[in-house]
């Protein structure tokens, strides 16, 4: 499935008071929180960020079917941002605590996509991420998840299947962004099995 840089740019126009603002664009990308700290994770964290950035650039070129010198692509890529949040105050926070932080940040620069429906997702690099010598698996977390909306009335179909997040490959953030253009995370995420996330999401369209 291919996109065009112009079409992608048009999807980034903000809507204010019901009107599309064609002279403005949202930045696109994700906030990523680091929750594991210590000397052994400092360099892997930097390598993880660089890997995400590098693969995002390549994937954006590939999805658009263009080369790096395309002026519309250059405008699109200039709007990409990986908002890396690393502070020892985040150490050990779980996805529910991070979701509260994401939704209640009162700083001058709010997390990415808090005002961008369908893309209200953030990323997490935690102890599971840094258990690998070369971190490659992160969590994608639904900023709008409410557990009561996903608890089934009975367990005939195996109980609750979605818990507001999914594991994913860190090199596929662009592909996930494109999936989010059309679907919510609860439809994208692989179903859990007895509450366990046994399947890591991987792109199958872009």
Placement of each model-derived feature along the sequence:
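Extended, charge-biased low-complexity segments
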Residues: 1-163
């Amino acid at each position: 499935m291919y996109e065009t840089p112009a079409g992608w740019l048009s999807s980034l126009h903000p809507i204010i008071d019901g009107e599309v603002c064609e002279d403005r664009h949202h930045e696109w990308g994700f906030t990523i929180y680091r929750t594991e700290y210590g000397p052994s994770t400092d360099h892997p964290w930097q390598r993880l960020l660089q890997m995400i950035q590098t693969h995002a650039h390549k994937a954006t070129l590939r999805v658009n079917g263009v080369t790096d010198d395309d002026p519309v692509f250059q405008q699109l890529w200039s709007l990409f941002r990986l908002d890396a949040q690393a502070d020892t105050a985040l150490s050990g926070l779980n996805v529910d605590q991070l979701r509260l932080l994401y939704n209640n940040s009162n700083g001058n620069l709010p997390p990415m996509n808090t005002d961008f429906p369908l893309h209200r997702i953030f990323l997490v690099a935690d102890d599971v991420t840094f258990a690998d010598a070369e971190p490659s698996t992160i969590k994608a977390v639904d900023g709008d998840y409410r557990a009561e909306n996903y608890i089934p009335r009975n367990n005939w179909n195996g109980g609750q299947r979605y818990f507001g997040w999914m594991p994913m490959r860190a090199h596929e953030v662009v592909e996930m962004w494109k999936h989010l253009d059309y679907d919510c995370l609860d439809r994208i995420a692989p179903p859990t099995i007895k509450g366990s996330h046994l399947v890591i999401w991987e792109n199958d369209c872009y």
